[in-house]
Swiss-Prot record:
GO terms for cellular component: nucleus. It comes from the Eukaryota. Gene3D superfamilies: 1.10.1420.10, DNA repair protein MutS, domain I, MutS, connector domain, P-loop containing nucleotide triphosphate hydrolases. This is DNA mismatch repair protein MSH3. It is found in: Nucleus. ATP binds at residues 789-796. GO terms for molecular function: ATP binding; ATP-dependent DNA damage sensor activity; double-stranded DNA binding; mismatched DNA binding. GO terms for biological process: mismatch repair; mitotic recombination. Component of the post-replicative DNA mismatch repair system (MMR). Heterodimerizes with MSH2 to form MutS beta, which binds to DNA mismatches thereby initiating DNA repair. MSH3 provides substrate-binding and substrate specificity to the complex. When bound, the MutS beta heterodimer bends the DNA helix and shields approximately 20 base pairs. Acts mainly to repair insertion-deletion loops (IDLs) from 2 to 13 nucleotides in size, but can also repair base-base and single insertion-deletion mismatches that occur during replication.
């Protein structure tokens, strides 16, 4: 048997008084007073402004040891219970004392535990339900939607809160610590008609809730943890429903679903360090056959970038791996890939806490993608761009169609209308292998895979979030065209002069002006895309236009013309910033700045459109009638200065001292009260308030329609606004490179076609930021070079240092050295580090050879190749044979190669190759113990000093001594074999 609210409360408080006060108290605890509204309104009303179909929670009941209270608190809507009469914790029910748990976590935890114990005890004490129990209207709506979207966590709007039901509530509780009310979590416990099945432990759904304004907070938390979240919105307004006398529950619909790759956080700020977490959604398809073709489509909904590619891949999917490492997707759509590719994606997503989803490709999307693309663009505002998409490969078009269906649930499919944002992954950029990106630590260190300790971490001195995002692209795509590199360097030099130079000229003035404008600027790139999607609110639209105007006003049209010849990169940037001033000014002239800053709907426009004028007239008419009613009440109560009061968001209340309430007419409805006063409404006032709320909601709806139209007009300028934002992001990247390049000990490189790498006082760009007293090196690489030296002597660090210097020079940055000569390089191909691939069933040696095979296929005479101990994963004879053959290939190719090895050089190099290959080693002192100097010297190393490393690692001395004796014998054998080989070679010559 269900306890009534009044019965439960009566266990705590004295019985209501009789007489006139009884009428007012009945309105308080939920009974139907005379002329107080329709039954539907009284049943579930939480306030006069809000009508929901959700019943109130049953209050927690406490057993008979509760001390009776001396006073009777007012329990009405909006009442202010005196702190002396309100128990602060469960313990205070027994002690009568007020206990504050806010600053005592331990006490707070005990209170929650005891509260949960009482709640569970009450559930057990409930008598067995013999009649059928049905879900309420809101719960049944959730149930019907949940059956169709079982993979989605649903947030259901109920008045001014969002409710989470069933197993969704359990997940939300576990992930976000929202309070959980126990109940049904399994859909099988509910019949299709919403009736709770026999044998269920509970008669109601488990649920959690939170206020409406926290929707973004909890959505972001769950989405970032890999969940799919859906918003079920109320499609009706309570005030309109009341006045129009509509029956039945609120209409609710699933309006949006969000995943890690489709969620765009509202707000305009953010840290420049946040860009290490990419938000690319990548769709993949793989054809069948011996040489499968992989098609990739990457979309970043927050910036509008669309990147596509189609390529043939090898056994270990090295081509796909480099794209995943560079793009760093947070979500992958499997549109049909092989089991080996799927395993690779699973491993990548698991390591990066991403989301892997299945997306079936429709038959018509494969058989006739052109027709489906034309259908997608039909009737759209910029349908003329359809031709751009039709020129793409067939499977790319198929993936666009599949991804657009996936984005439709998030209302983001209009992304593909912006075809100017389409680019191919492969272009006129330096090729970087997957191992290169990982081993050189371009975006994440190899220890904990965070940004700190990466090249991007060193270079990211950007002022804006969107600038940092663009810089990440620059690092992943070094330039290979000499002219483009020199033009970028020219811009960097000019900015260095403005930052560190004493002299000032017109160009320096423009640079400093733009730097000041960018420092406080929000994430305009993300705001611009949200404008395109129709997601910006009034305040955000105003801020976007205002920030664009601030920049545009400082740069007149043609302000960069004079620099086009001398500094074309900066000249084009300045020209892109000042050409749309009039368009922005016209849009801002329509906006009331004060109202926009407050996100105020009713006064947003300076001049109201005709539709708003009529609605405001209706509202003023009702407000005039409310003033007339106030005059009548003043006369009736003989209170000439009487004014309406507002409490807790409830307006138009008549405040009366409690001592005078007995004189009031019985038909007056009590709304709220305190110890000293009570607040009422008359029947006439109730009617006027409902009309007022109706007019306000109608006006708000009209304001929303007008604002949506205005926002759409702003969105038509998307391409113009985007050109400004792109120019700002490019300047921000140049500024970041200038901040780094302007440091002491950095130098502009000389670019050559031949002559090799020549670095004086070269340093490791990352390591010198993490430690002091870094030892520099003079480096000359003219041909394939074999690097030897002791373990822990710095061989791997040195070759990474060289590669990073080459990469820095190709993105338009200075190099950490006192002098630098660097050849134009088309690729940096790296095979370093020992790792296996258990998910793909590949051993360390297999991974090593597959990556080596990729390098052999792609290397050219203009490549920089880094190979670290090739052949070490197998027997010595096989390893030497493989290393010998690989090194010989690069000697014949004449590619700049750094070949690290511990193998005997006599077995590694043929006599005819000795003059075509240089030998260097990392020096070490001959002291005991030896000291690493970390200096590169010509020639080969005499020993690897592996036993010294064994001692440092803690290997017992007895074992080291035994190994030392064994090593001497083996060394004698090797020297004997080397002598025999030399005599044989001499004999051949003679």
């Amino acid at each position: 048997m269900k306890r009534s609210k009044q019965a439960t409360l009566s266990r705590f408080f004295k019985k209501p008084k009789t007489g006139a006060d009884a009428v007012h108290t009945e309105a308080v605890i939920g009974k139907k007073p005379t002329d107080s509204g329709s039954p539907a309104e009284q049943k579930d009303a939480k306030s006069p402004q809000q009508v929901t179909d959700e019943p109130p929670l049953e209050p927690v009941t406490v057993t008979t040891d509760v001390v009776a209270m001396d006073t009777q608190p007012d329990l009405s809507i909006g009442s202010e219970i005196n702190s002396k009469s309100r128990p602060k914790s469960l313990a205070s029910f027994k002690s009568g004392k007020s206990i504050n748990t806010d600053h005592n976590p331990e006490l707070k935890q005990k209170f929650r535990a005891k509260l949960e114990l009482v709640r569970n005890k009450n559930d057990e004490d409930l008598p067995v339900i013999t009649k059928k129990t049905k879900l309420n209207a809101t719960e049944f709506q959730w149930y019907e939607i949940k059956k169709q979207h079982r993979d989605t966590l649903l947030f259901v709007q109920v008045g001014y809160k969002y409710h989470i039901y069933g197993d969704d509530a359990e997940i939300a509780h576990a992930q976000t610590r929202l309070f959980l009310s126990p109940g049904i979590t399994n859909l099988k416990d509910i019949g299709n008609d919403g009736v709770v099945q026999q044998g269920s432990k509970y008669i109601k759904l488990a649920y959690s809730s939170f206020p409406v304004h926290r929707i973004d907070f909890y959505t972001k938390q769950l989405v970032e943890k890999g969940f799919k979240v859906g918003h079920v919105q109320q499609m009706e307004v309570a005030a309109l429903k009341n006045v129009e006398n509509k029956k039945g529950p609120m209409i609710r619909e699933l309006t949006n679903t969000f995943t890690k790759g489709t969620y765009i956080e509202s707000g305009n700020g953010g840290s420049v360090n946040d860009v290490q977490y990419s938000s690319y959604l990548v769709a993949l398809h793989e054809s069948k056959g011996d040489k499968p073709t992989v098609t990739l489509l990457a979309t970043e909904v927050s910036t509008g970038d669309v990147i596509w590619d189609s390529f043939n891949d090898d056994y270990v999917k090295s081509e796909l791996e480099i794209r995943l490492l560079t793009l760093a997707p947070c979500e992958i759509l499997n549109c049909g890939v092989s089991s080996s590719t799927l395993k690779m994606c699973q491993k990548y997503m698991h390591r990066n806490k991403g989301r892997l989803a299945e997306m079936n490709v429709l038959e018509e999307e494969v058989e006739d993608p052109d027709a489906q693309v034309a259908l997608f663009f039909e009737g759209k505002a910029n349908a003329g761009t359809c031709s751009t998409v039709l020129e793409l490969p067939a499977m790319v078009k198929t993936l666009i169609l599949a991804t657009s269906r996936y984005l439709t649930h998030c209302k983001l499919d209009s992304l593909f209308l912006l075809t100017n944002n389409f680019t191919r992954y492969t272009g006129s950029y330096m090729r970087l292998s997957a191992n290169t990106v990982a081993s050189l630590e371009l975006f994440a260190n190899t220890t904990d895979h965070t940004a700190k300790g990466s090249l991007f971490w060193v270079l990211n001195r950007c002022l804006t979030v969107f600038g940092s995002r663009e810089l990440k692209k620059w690092v992943s795509r070094p330039l290979t065209d000499r002219t483009a590199i020199l033009q970028r360097l020219s811009a960097v030099e000019a900015i260095i002069k403005s930052i560190y130079g004493a002299e000032s000229d017109e160009l320096t003035t423009l640079i400093n002006k733009l730097v000041k404008l960018l420092k406080p600027i929000p994430d305009l790139s993300k705001m611009l895309m949200r404008l395109h999607y129709g997601q910006l609110n009034r305040k955000e639209v105003y801020l976007l236009l205002r920030e664009l105007l601030f920049v545009a006003q400082e740069f007149k049209p043609g302000s960069g013309d004079k620099y086009i010849d001398t500094n074309p990169v900066l000249g084009e940037i300045f020209n892109s910033l000042g050409i749309h001033v009039s368009d922005i000014e016209k849009l801002l002239e329509e906006i009331n700045p004060d109202a926009a800053r407050q996100d105020e709907a009713l006064t947003f426009f300076v001049t109201d459109p005709p539709s708003l004028v009529d609605r405001k007239k209706d509202l003023k008419k009702v407000e005039a009638e409310l003033q007339i009613e106030l005059l009548a009440l003043r006369a009736e109560l003989n209170r000439p200065k009487l004014q309406y009061s507002s409490v807790a968001g409830i307006d138009y209340l008549i405040e009366v001292a409690n001592k005078d309430t007995k004189k009031l007419p019985l038909e007056w409805t009590k709304i709220s009260g305190t110890k000293s006063v009570s607040r009422f409404r008359t029947p006439t006032l109730n009617s006027l308030v409902k009309r007022h709320e109706y007019c306000v909601e109608k006006l708000k709806a009209a304001c929303d329609i007008e604002f949506n139209m205005f926002r759409s007009r702003c969105a038509t300028h998307y391409e113009f606004f985007r050109s400004m934002v792109v120019a700002m992001s490019q300047f921000d990247c140049l500024f970041a490179l200038a901040k780094v390049s302007g440091q002491s000990g950095w130098v502009k490189a000389d670019y050559v076609d031949e002559g090799g790498i020549d670095l004086k006082d070269s340093r490791h760009v990352i390591t010198e930021k993490l430690m002091t007293n870094y030892i520099s090196n003079d480096i000359k690489i003219r041909c394939p070079t074999v690097v030897t030296g002791p373990n822990m002597g710095g061989k791997s660090s040195l070759v990474r240092q060289i590669a990073l210097s080459v990469l820095l020079a190709h993105i338009g940055c200075y190099v950490p050295a006192s002098k630098a000569q660097i050849p134009i390089t088309d690729s940096i191909l790296c095979r370093m580090g020992a790792q296996d691939n258990i998910m793909s069933g590949q051993s360390t040696f297999m991974v090593e050879l597959c990556e080596c095979a990729e390098i052999l296929r792609n290397a050219t005479s203009k490549s920089l190749v880094l190979l670290d101990e090739i052949g070490r994963g197998t027997t010595t004879t096989d390893g030497i044979a493989i290393a010998h053959s690989v090194l010989k290939h690069f000697i014949e190719l004449e590619a700049l190669t750094l070949f690290i090895t511990h193998y005997p050089l006599g077995q590694l190099l043929d006599s005819e190759d000795s003059n075509k290959c240089d030998l260097v080693h990392m020096d070490i002192t001959n002291t005991n113990p030896p000291i690493f100097t970390y200096k590169m010297k010509p020639g080969s190393a005499t020993d690897s000093y592996g036993l010294n490393v064994a001692g440092l690692a803690g290997i017992p001395q007895a074992i080291i001594n035994r190994a030392e004796e064994m090593g001497k014998d083996m060394k004698h054998d090797v020297m004997y074999q080397e002598g025999v080989r030399m005599l044989t070679d001499i004999k051949k010559v003679m």
